[in-house]
């Protein structure tokens, strides 16, 4: 049966995903940055209270995936922490300035991760040649690749995703970016074995007093009075589609 991974940005989101049938969680912070390394407090709380597999993301900042030596050193320390806390896997990605997988740094990441399953995240979609990148990641021992097929969303990139799946069984290709209940069946019919979804919704902040003339964000257009949450009904609907597909 296809595996459903849900991207979560808090303990509350992780609990919602687990209750509604998620098979695995990618744990992140900072949804507006596309996901950054969670804090120690969030990592520890989730490790203690969530029973399904959780893979934290290791990403020190938003933007591109070419990191300074200092940023990369911090990533290795975060990997060691995730390993010490007992998580079964992690999610990360590093590129060279030319858009190739940084194999030298991936070797260090794999050594630091040890027995943990490593997912190479959507840095893959920023690679110059996805097929060369996949071969390199297979050589590195990466367990899976999260990809939209190098398109804005996975529905647009499905043909490339299918080509990547045809390359072989390792790493597993996980489709993500815009995967929802209304298009999930297309991925299942195409033979995608793992899917990744945010299943997210923005809810209004409970704050009654709002200083509309002041922003705490560098982006003055940012809505600071909305909060990201995983929508339990969306997770349950996707899990139901997967179960029915398996029963065919």
Swiss-Prot record:
Localization (cell): Cytoplasm
Location, primary (coarse class): cytoplasm
Recorded superkingdom: Bacteria
Keyword field contains Ligase: no
Gene Ontology MF terms in the entry: copper ion binding
InterPro entries, A to Z: CutC-like (IPR005627), CutC-like_dom_sf (IPR036822)
Keywords, alphabetical: Cytoplasm
GO cellular component, one term: cytoplasm
Keyword rRNA processing assigned: no
Matching Gene3D superfamilies: Copper homeostasis (CutC) domain
Subunit structure: Homodimer.
Similarity comment: family membership: Belongs to the CutC family.
Entry-linked HAMAP family: CutC
Protein name: PF03932 family protein CutC
Gene (name only): cutC
């Amino acid at each position: 049966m296809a595996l459903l991974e849900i991207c979560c940005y808090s303990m509350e989101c992780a609990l919602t995903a687990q209750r509604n049938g998620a098979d695995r969680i990618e744990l992140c912070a900072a949804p507006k940055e596309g996901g950054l390394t969670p804090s120690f407090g969030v990592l520890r709380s989730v490790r203690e209270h969530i029973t399904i597999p959780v893979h934290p993301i290791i990403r020190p900042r938003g933007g591109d995936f070419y990191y300074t030596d200092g940023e990369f050193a911090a990533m290795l320390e975060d990997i060691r922490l995730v390993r010490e806390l007992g998580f079964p896997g992690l999610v990360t990605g590093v590129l060279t300035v030319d858009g190739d997988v940084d194999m030298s740094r991936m070797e260090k990441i794999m050594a630091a991760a040890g027995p943990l399953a490593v997912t190479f995240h959507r840095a893959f979609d920023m690679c110059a040649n996805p097929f060369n990148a996949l071969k390199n990641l297979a050589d590195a021992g990466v367990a899976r690749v999260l990809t939209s097929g190098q398109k804005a969303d996975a529905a647009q990139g499905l043909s490339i995703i299918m080509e990547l799946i045809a390359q072989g069984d390792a790493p597993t290709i996980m489709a993500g970016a815009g995967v929802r209940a209304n298009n999930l069946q297309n991925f299942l019919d195409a033979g995608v074995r793992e899917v990744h979804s945010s299943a997210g919704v923005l809810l209004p902040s409970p704050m009654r007093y709002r200083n509309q003339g002041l922003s705490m964000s560098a982006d003055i257009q940012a809505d600071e009075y909305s909060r990201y949450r995983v929508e339990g009904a969306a997770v349950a609907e996707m899990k139901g589609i997967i179960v029915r597909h398996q029963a065919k």
